[in-house]
Amino acid sequence: MTTVTPELLTVPEVMARLKVGRSKVYDLIRTRRLASIKIDGARRVPTDAVRDFIQDQLGEAI
């Protein structure tokens, strides 16, 4: 059986991809618009969650 491990991004990496500040990323996480997990106290965001967030934003823009 093959297990696919999702690529996880740090908050600064998400900031760079979305071109937003740290507080905006945490706001998106807090409001559950951006999925995330904690690993030993460190916040990580799956790349799929960032992609899904961007797709949702594009859908709202149309």
From Swiss-Prot:
InterPro entries: HTH_17, SinI_DNA-bd. One of its GO terms (biological process) is DNA recombination. Keywords: DNA recombination, DNA-binding, Plasmid, Viral genome excision. It comes from the Bacteria. GO terms for molecular function: DNA binding. Pfam families: HTH_17. This is Excisionase. It comes from Streptomyces ambofaciens.
